Amino acid sequence: MVMEKPSPLLVGREFVRQYYTLLNQAPDMLHRFYGKNSSYVHGGLDSNGKPADAVYGQKEIHRKVMSQNFTNCHTKIRHVDAHATLNDGVVVQVMGLLSNNNQALRRFMQTFVLAPEGSVANKFYVHNDIFRYQDEVFGGFITEPQEESEEEVEEPEERQQTPEVVPDDSGTFYDQTVSNDLEEHLEEPVAEPEPEPEPEPEQEPVSEVQEEKSEPVLEETAPEDVQKSSSPAPADIAQTVQEDLRTFSWASVTSKNLPPSGAVPVTGIPPHVVKVPASQPRPESKPESQIPLQRPQRDQRVREQRINVPPQRGPRPVREAGEQGDVEPRRIVRHPDSHQLFIGNLPHEVDKSELKDFFQNYGNVVELRINSGGKLPNFGFVVFDDSEPVQKVLSNRPIMFRGEVRLNVEEKKTRAAREGDRRDNRLRGPGGPRGGLGGGMRGPPRGGMVQKPGFGVGRSIAPRQ
């Protein structure tokens, strides 16, 4: 019976489950996923403050892994992408959160290139591995969202002339929770407000998580079992992905000295490469881009006629709103910007009293606002009675809330700084952030690609449900 070839996504998800399970249970065995010519990058900076270089080969990778002091690592996988690449390889991108040695969770991105091991079908090893913590790349910077209360009252005309589009970060996510003893939480995606005022929304296709009963997946292996296998054998379809790891063998992963026949060439594309069509921008965005050009003219006419004719469109003047008694209370107290802090990445279930008690440790809190506009995470503002607590909070960053949530704390910008940012954004126009990725792409790894199976499957290739 000829078994069907597993899809790249199925291969990627099974690899992710095995890799992060071993990272939690036996990090000293992690180097067995790699081969003699594998490359490995795991974030961090060297002694000169520059991004650390890659290391090559099992010995160097093992030394690098041990230097990370992985202890009781818990991983929350938020998303896994996998695509077919050259010579039946699979490229896998993982996004999630990682906690090492019971420290706070940190967002990370990791990319693997899985190459065929060569001697056994559907057996892979890690040829390239790139890992980065997001806070090492982006830092704790976050752009302050537009205030909605005071500036709507005091500057209604400016708000008309500079409409700002709030980007929709509510992408589709699914929890890819690793099936070891890791914590399983159905959390909302940790998204932050984008700094660009006029983003062009793009929608990426998201792979549906479907169980494929007829496709084989890679057999699970464990370091405790030392039984050596000689040839692959089919297993029953009833075998499931959640079987105990200790029932499989890791000996075949390290005992084989493979010939270079399984090397990955740099030419040729396998016939099963998954081509995902990129979504095209909608043509209806064109008339929307013309609206800001027409609004200033209409606003100018409204201002010229304001003395005799009340405006028919747009926000009502402050004079009329004040008569209704819904605006004047907001203007009673005006706190200096130096007494205020912007707080981002707030948990969606946090309440004002809990957050106020937390910041009371730094000084007297006179006012606290939490803005929850339907998008997560929430953000807010804390007002102290003096500027000293503000500087105290800023000097103690990073600020950990509940011991596990890292708050994005920034000093509130002055009005002139906010207006300057808006002018810069309008001059720059729509598009992505300025600049590009730091550094350049590294060339191909040195030498031939003689593999040591890391993502080995042991004795057999078993179909999974």
From Swiss-Prot:
Locations listed in the record: Cytoplasm, Cytosol; Perikaryon; Cytoplasm, Stress granule; Nucleus
Compositional bias per record (Basic and acidic residues), positions renumbered to this chain: 296-306, 317-326, 412-427
Biological processes annotated in GO: innate immune response; stress granule assembly
Cofactor: Mg(2+)
Placement of covalent cross-link Glycyl lysine isopeptide (Lys-Gly) (interchain with G-Cter in SUMO2): K375
Modified-residue entries (Phosphoserine), positions: S149, S230, S231, S249, S252, S372
Disordered: region residues: 145-242, 254-326, 412-465
Any GO MF annotation of the entry: DNA helicase activity
Segments of skewed composition (Acidic residues): 145-157, 184-205
Keywords: Acetylation, ATP-binding, Cytoplasm, DNA-binding, Endonuclease, Helicase, Hydrolase, Immunity, Innate immunity, Isopeptide bond, Methylation, Nuclease, Nucleotide-binding, Nucleus, Phosphoprotein, RNA-binding, Transport, Ubl conjugation
Modified-residue entries (Dimethylated arginine), positions: R459
Catalytic activity: ATP + H2O = ADP + phosphate + H(+)
GO cellular component: cytoplasmic stress granule; cytosol; nucleus; perikaryon
Phosphothreonine modifications at: T143
Every NTF2 domain range: 11-133
Major localisation: cytoplasm
One Pfam match: NTF2
Residue segments, region RG-rich region: 409-465
Activity regulation comment: Under physiological conditions, G3BP1 adopts a compact state that is stabilized by intramolecular interactions between the RG-rich and the acidic regions that inhibit phase separation. Upon stress, polysomes disassemble and mRNAs are released in an unfolded protein-free state.
Gly residues biased stretches: 429-446
InterPro entries (alphabetical): G3BP1_RRM, NTF2-like_dom_sf, NTF2_dom, Nuclear_transport_factor_2_euk, Nucleotide-bd_a/b_plait_sf, Ras_GTPase_bind_prot, RBD_domain_sf, RRM_dom
Notes on the domains: Can mediate both protein-protein and protein-RNA interactions via the NTF2 domain and RNA-binding domain RRM; protein-protein and protein-RNA interactions are essential for undergoing liquid-liquid phase separation (LLPS).
Task of the protein: Protein involved in various processes, such as stress granule formation and innate immunity. Plays an essential role in stress granule formation. Stress granules are membraneless compartments that store mRNAs and proteins, such as stalled translation pre-initiation complexes, in response to stress. Promotes formation of stress granules phase-separated membraneless compartment by undergoing liquid-liquid phase separation (LLPS) upon unfolded RNA-binding: functions as a molecular switch that triggers RNA-dependent LLPS in response to a rise in intracellular free RNA concentrations.
Protein name per the record: Ras GTPase-activating protein-binding protein 1
High-level lineage: Eukaryota, Metazoa, Chordata, Craniata, Vertebrata
